[in-house]
Each structure stands twice: as structure tokens, then as C-alpha cells.
Amino acid sequence: MKLIVALGNPGLKYEKTKHNTGFMALDHYLDEKGLRLDRDKFTALYAKEKVAGEDVIFMEPQTYMNESGRAVGAAAKFFKIDPSDILVIHDDMDMPIAKLRIRAGGKSGGHNGIKSIIACLGTEKFNRLKIGIRHPDKQSVVSWVLTPFNPDQQKELEASFAKVDQIIDDFIAGKDAQYLMNRYN
């Protein structure tokens, strides 16, 4: 069983903000597959689906970003999912807008959602799909991540979602992190 987690903040206020890039990417994937998050448990919206013969949990925690680990930890424990079978999709401001990078474990890189997941899982050994949102020039980091993309940036971001969909499909199909990094990084 795989667990695909998208990070973001709940509520309409944050819906199109840079910090919700993970939610936007997973929502695109689910729309393309005709799936929806139809369950509410673990302080998260989730769906349990069969994709390409594999049982998959798709999840969007409904806590604020820095509490995301609670939902991920609870779901991983409940469904008995090994951290190596978890893929977390999240924003990364150390990369240009829409740039994608896969990592197999490692530190949080200062991302509070990832810090929370590491703390709740008790390990750094889970997979991440980072989506670039660019570092703010002179704007504060908090204000940058909590504002929407401008129309050109939004277009660029949405153009990357087809590749995100391929990465998710490959992960579900059992391609390991090394394969994904070699193919997509």
C-alpha cells in the first residue's frame, strides 16, 4: 500500500497560495483520474483507491502546515504503511517556480510540514516530491508563501502538473526513489 500526501493549509483563504502547491498538484492528479478525497479521518481528507492494481491512500492533512505530521503519522500507523511507501508532495522555495525534484529522505530543509512529518514518523526516510515556488526577493518568507502566484507563475506551475502526474503514477507502480530521481531530477 502507498500513501501519497500533499501538503498545504486548509480553507479557502489559503487555497491558491504558494504554500498550497502540494494540494494543487494532488488535486490535479485526482481530477485527471476522476478521483476525489471523500473521507475525513486522521485530521485529513483522504481517499483509499486501487490504482494500477495497487492500494493507495491519497491524503491532504487539514491541519496547518506545521502540524501535518499528525495526520501522516496516524494514517501510516493505521494502514501499516512503511515510510519508504510514502510520497509527500510539497512546495520548496529554494527552487525556481515549477521546478520538480525528488528526494529519498533527508532533513527538512527548513520546511515546517516536513519537520512535523519527520517528528511524527520518527524517521527522515520517506520520499518527497518538491515543487519550486522560488525564494522571495525582499518580501518576508511568511508573506511570500501565503500569497497566490501571479497569472504567469500559475500557468508555469500548472504546466508542471502533467510531469507530477507521471511521477505519482511511477511511484504507485513501484518505481523506487533512485529510479524516480534518475528519471525526473
UniProtKB/Swiss-Prot annotation:
Q: Indicate the principal place this protein occupies in or around the cell.
A: cytoplasm
Which transformation does this protein catalyse, written as a reaction?
Answer: an N-acyl-L-alpha-aminoacyl-tRNA + H2O = an N-acyl-L-amino acid + a tRNA + H(+)
The regions listed as transmembrane in this protein's record are: none
Q: Which GO terms describe its molecular function?
A: peptidyl-tRNA hydrolase activity; tRNA binding
List the GO biological process terms. Answer: protein quality control for misfolded or incompletely synthesized proteins; rescue of stalled ribosome
Write the record's keywords in alphabetical order, separated by commas: Cytoplasm, Hydrolase, RNA-binding, tRNA-binding
Supply the Gene3D superfamilies for this chain. Answer: Peptidyl-tRNA hydrolase
Q: Mind telling me which PANTHER family this protein's record contains? A: PEPTIDYL-TRNA HYDROLASE
Name of this chain's protein = Peptidyl-tRNA hydrolase
